[in-house]
Amino acid sequence: MYKAVVKLIKIFMSLIFRVEVHGLENVPDDGGFILCSNHISCWDPLVIQTNVKRRIYFMAKAELFRIFFVSWILKLIKAIPVKRNGSDLNAVKSAIKTIKSGHCLGIFPTGPRAKFGDEGEVKSGIGFIACKTDAPGLPVHINATFKIFSKVTVNIGKCAQYWNGEGKPTAEDFDEISKRIYKDIKTLGKGD
């Protein structure tokens, strides 16, 4: 059912947006990794999921699971609910388990959507997850206004190891890794 729903969503999206994807060859065929993208619209996870060959287990704010149809889709794609007040240990544990099971975790380093042109604040959670799993990160940049019939450009960078695995990581390491990942995401957007 998952594949059928993704195909239907892709057809729907192709009717309202002109999606152009660069770097699909950079998406690993197997193994756990963290797909990290900028977050400008509620369309972002759908644009990424319908154009990437791997199933992505996105982290999504818990409030979305209270909206009937949205909740149904999120449960179908096995999104991980995240409580936004403070740190959500259950969500972090689920994210780590997802990656260690060989799956792709989708995460937006700034958390909630950033307004157009605003970068938002990079959260350290992605650095924490990268250190705990020793998983590579796959930077993705979306450039779009998401107006009807507009062009949506998705640039996928190369997978990179952001944690060297040496020593015990600190809170500063988590912040540094998160910022490096976000810098790579922004760099992908400079060509648009």
Which residue stretches match the model-derived regions?
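Structural motif corresponding to alpha-helix initiation and N-cap regions
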Residues: 21-24, 67, 89-92
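Short gly/ser/thr-rich secondary-structure transition/capping motifs
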Residues: 14-22
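Short, basic, glycine/proline-bearing loop/turn elements
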Residues: 9, 76-81, 109-112
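Non-catalytic C-terminal accessory region of glycerolipid acyltransferases
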Residues: 90-192
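Short, glycine/polar-rich helix-capping loops at beta-to-alpha or helix-loop-helix junctions
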Residues: 5, 65-70, 147-149
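Short amphipathic alpha-helix with an adjacent loop that forms part of the alpha/beta core around
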Residues: 25-28, 96-97
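Catalytic core of membrane glycerolipid acyltransferases/transacylases, capturing the structured
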Residues: 14, 27-86
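N-terminal nucleotide/polyanion-binding subdomain common to many enzyme families
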Residues: 3-12
